[in-house]
UniProtKB/Swiss-Prot annotation:
Gene3D superfamilies: Rhodanese-like domain (3.40.250.10). GO terms for cellular component: cytoplasm. It comes from Erwinia tasmaniensis (strain DSM 17950 / CFBP 7177 / CIP 109463 / NCPPB 4357 / Et1/99). It is found in: Cytoplasm. This is Thiosulfate sulfurtransferase GlpE. It catalyses: thiosulfate + hydrogen cyanide = thiocyanate + sulfite + 2 H(+); thiosulfate + [thioredoxin]-dithiol = [thioredoxin]-disulfide + hydrogen sulfide + sulfite + 2 H(+). SUPFAM superfamilies: Rhodanese/Cell cycle control phosphatase. Residues 17-105 form the Rhodanese domain. One of its GO terms (molecular function) is thiosulfate-cyanide sulfurtransferase activity. Keywords: Cytoplasm, Transferase.
Length: 107
């Protein structure tokens, strides 16, 4: 995959279930701590190096932000770092929270 793809939240759910995808949330730490998709990893400038070092780059990575805009650049960046596939989740956490309130956690 040379270019990331945009997917909706239902497609993201499917990839998490079927493809053993990684889910990362790039929102700020305070927003992530208040609420995030269950199982999401908080990806920040600080957590990026260990994340890249410890992740299986063959697994697809799904990127979530607030509304689905910032995640596009992050998904493309992760592709450039060696991930085999990267996806930006349209609607971001806000769409996820509305559609899947039972799959939202807080720290």
């Amino acid at each position: 995959m040379e270019q990331f793809e945009c997917i909706n939240i239902q497609q993201a759910q499917q990839k998490l279930a079927d493809d053993n995808a990684l889910l990362v949330d790039i929102r700020d730490a305070q927003s992530f701590a208040a609420a995030h998709a269950s199982g999401a990893f908080h990806l920040s400038n600080e957590s990026l190096p260990p994340f890249l070092a410890q992740s299986d780059l063959a697994r697809p990575v799904l990127v979530m932000c607030y509304h689905g805009n910032s995640s596009k650049g992050a998904a493309q960046y992760l592709l450039g770092q060696g991930f085999s596939a990267a996806y930006s989740i349209d609607g971001g956490f806000e769409a996820w929270r509305i559609a899947f309130p039972q799959q939202v956690s807080a720290q």
